[in-house]
């Protein structure tokens, strides 16, 4: 059986927050604002995986109204979902993700992100692709108000 899921997430940039994307801390003057650590990439990936197994969305499992998840490490949330997915007999076919940000430049961190995501999903890094783009200064990401991410995942059983 093959299952496909897609995920999307966006978070606002704010001062006095760490910028964590793909499980990697990126030095920058702003970070992403959210109930958890606001890792926009891991949230999109988690949502894609949840969608692939037909189990709703990330908010169903980790509601932002629950203080248990306040400042939660998104890598731990992804690992929790992945444990359920593996218990159901699925494994990663491949994952393709895009980070949409004007600044900071993501290229220096993409390889670290790939390795961290592969580790969390018990996969080879060749099964994980992460890329980044800008919106040519258009929209909220172009105005540097936030960062967005898209993810598509293929699961095999």
Swiss-Prot record:
Keywords, sorted A to Z: Isoprene biosynthesis, Lyase, Metal-binding
Protein's pathway: Isoprenoid biosynthesis; isopentenyl diphosphate biosynthesis via DXP pathway; isopentenyl diphosphate from 1-deoxy-D-xylulose 5-phosphate: step 4/6
GO molecular function list: 2-C-methyl-D-erythritol 2,4-cyclodiphosphate synthase activity; metal ion binding
Residues reported in the UniProt entry to bind a divalent metal cation: 9, 11, 43
Catalysed reaction, written as an equation: 4-CDP-2-C-methyl-D-erythritol 2-phosphate = 2-C-methyl-D-erythritol 2,4-cyclic diphosphate + CMP
Subunit: Homotrimer.
Similarity-based family: Belongs to the IspF family.
Protein's UniProt name: 2-C-methyl-D-erythritol 2,4-cyclodiphosphate synthase
Taxonomic placement: Bacteria, Bacillati, Bacillota, Bacilli, Bacillales
């Amino acid at each position: 059986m093959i299952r496909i899921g897609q995920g999307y997430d966006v978070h606002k940039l704010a001062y006095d927050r760490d910028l964590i994307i793909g499980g990697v801390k990126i030095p920058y003057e702003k970070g992403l604002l959210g109930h958890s650590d606001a890792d926009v990439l891991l949230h999109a990936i988690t949502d894609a995986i949840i969608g692939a197994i037909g189990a709703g969305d990330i908010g169903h499992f980790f509601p932002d109204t629950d203080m248990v998840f306040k400042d939660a490490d998104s890598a731990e949330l992804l690992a929790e979902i992945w444990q359920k997915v593996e218990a159901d007999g699925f494994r990663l076919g491949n994952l393709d993700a895009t980070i949409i940000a004007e600044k900071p430049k993501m290229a220096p961190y993409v390889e670290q992100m790939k390795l961290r995501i592969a580790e969390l999903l018990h996969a080879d890094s060749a099964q994980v692709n992460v890329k980044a783009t800008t919106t040519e200064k258009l929209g909220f990401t172009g105005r540097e108000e936030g960062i967005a991410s898209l993810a598509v995942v293929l699961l095999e059983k």
